[in-house]
Amino acid sequence: MGDPSKQDILTIFKRLRSVPTNKVCFDCGAKNPSWASITYGVFLCIDCSGSHRSLGVHLSFIRSTELDSNWSWFQLRCMQVGGNANASSFFHQHGCSTSDTNAKYNSRAAQLYREKIKSLASQATRKHGTDLWLDSCVVPPLSPPPKEEDFFASHVSPEVSDTAWASAIAEPSSLTSRPVETTLENNEGGQEQGPSVEGLNVPSKAALEVSSIIKKKPNQAKKGLGAKKGSLGAQKLANTCFNEIEKQAQAADKMKEQEDLAKAAPKEESIVSSLRLAYKDLEIQMKKDEKLNISGKKNVDSDRLGMGFGNCRSGISHSVTSDMQTIEQESPIMAKPRKKYNDDSDDSYFTSSSRYFDEAVELRSSSFSSWDDSSDSYWKKETSKDTETILKTTGYSDRPTARRKPDYEPVENTDEAQKKFGNVKAISSDMYFGRQAQADYETRARLERLSASSSISSADLFEEQRKQAAGNYSLSNVLPSAPNMAQFKQGVRSVAGKLSVFANGVVTSIQDRYGS
């Protein structure tokens, strides 16, 4: 037995899906299911087919009715002997009404139905072979054929329908008698009566319309035709004059317009009164400005300074603008920053004094190295230095206004430093600028003096005096020697000179600041 062709598969499923119960999903009731469970012979939607796949093929085998084309005859027979109607009735008979997929298809009823579908499909395959149709595949055996429901028939009871037909039969006579009465009433009313109803005199047309209404919508016969005999649901026209009604409507419109105008008039009057008050305020303000003779520029200045009349809340105002004068600013002369100048000068005094003390320390240190020099030349040098410092600092007018910065001589861009320090790994600024010559000379002198000794200490190398033992004092150690006394005198003299120079500068600055 060969496999069915694609055309056979489409033909079989087209006929199976034409059954009303197979047009919805077996599990959720969604319309137009396109998947099928071969194990139970039911049609499923795509969402429920995913749930069946998670159960496993031993419980439910899923295939597509539109995409899959490799169906076998046994699988087609399972779908033909099954169906949604057969499966739902079988599960209902065995008491399985749960909507949970796992509980439903793992139940005893699902197991029995699987075995039943398998046995019926095997019998149909042996009996019919490759025939497309089975004897019982068109009408499901376990469910009666569905009857199409009529919407109007379900809403209309038999008694009501009989009444509607009886009223429809008796209707033409009432239609013929009704227009005659209306025409008589119209003739008695005169010419100014309502619209004519002469069109209702034709009985044949009215009878046709009534019959068509009854055929299409029998439920409406209950409302219009069965409730009242001899009426179509239209109201009877009264003997009224349409001209009078029109006049009344026009009069009502005129009254409404007059009421609207009466309501709008107070609003317009309030707006006009507010505008008049605003203009009066402006006129009063302009008169005040004219009285005070305020020009445009003064008025702007007074408003800018916060002295305008518009900012005055009370009626009393100060006459500031009457004596207002415009002062033209001339080019200002830059004043000398006296305070800054004096502060800088004071700073220069303090910095100069520190410089003097630094020079004294340098002189003190140099006196040790040049002890062998004559005292006369030493005193001459010191006196010349003191006079130079006095001449430098006594001139107050020649002092700079700003703090003096040290003058650095620019280093010439030559190749001497590169030739001198080319092979050296590290150099200092003193070595680069040549400020280490004196220190190197003193160091070489100490090394030559200690070259004959067998051992030296750091105190001998740096000429540090050793601490003498306690109790080993002599008169020579207590009294200062002649060189120390001379050095002391020279230091006292230099300090006294510096103090006199500093005092002279302070007195001069006080006189310049407070005397003049």
From Swiss-Prot:
Protein's cellular compartments: Cytoplasm; Golgi apparatus membrane
A GO biological process held by the record: COPI coating of Golgi vesicle
Regulation of activity: GAP activity stimulated by phosphatidylinositol 4,5-bisphosphate (PIP2).
One of the Pfam families matching this protein, by short name: ArfGap
Keywords: Coiled coil, Cytoplasm, ER-Golgi transport, Golgi apparatus, GTPase activation, Membrane, Metal-binding, Phosphoprotein, Protein transport, Transport, Zinc, Zinc-finger
Residues covered by region (Disordered): 170-199, 392-414
One Gene Ontology cellular component: Golgi membrane
Name of the protein in question: ADP-ribosylation factor GTPase-activating protein 3
Encoding gene (name): ARFGAP3
